Amino acid sequence: LECDAFCHEKFFHIYLRNANSQLLVMRPDSDDAGFENVTDHEIKKDTGMNFDMHYYKTTKPSEGMPVAFSVKVDDKNYYMCCEEESGKMIVRFKEGQVPKDISGDSNIIFFKREFNSTKEFKFEYSLEQGMFLAFEPEGIYRKLILKKLSREDEVDETTKIRI
């Protein structure tokens, strides 16, 4: 199947953990997500903890596998996207499904790259080279953000995400 840019290929149910083994949890009331101390026994379905990672085929050569993320909370589906707010790129979650086909550029696509093992990755935002999903402390939890790295090969533990 050929398309202009990205065609949905498959998806996997996953849990996303940061370098501190904290679990990514999406909060629909604030349209964002953060990493929290959650054990495997505390994980519940449809509570913003169990993500789907959608793989896309692309006609353009890319630095890594194009992926998008979605999550279900209380029988509603949300997808991860990036938007500019007050001159800064932020990670948001919007109600809806990830599209099957995406023509052209998209604010939901990230390039999955190996970090340093087969289970640890970093995810580069497709619309801005050098911008990666990361986390930063905010109050009692670590908020999911986009972070600019000065060099592509820079090792930054805040961008490491374990699947």
Regions found by a protein language model. Give the residues of each.
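Lectin-like carbohydrate-binding module/patch detector with strong preference for beta-trefoil
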Residues: 1-163
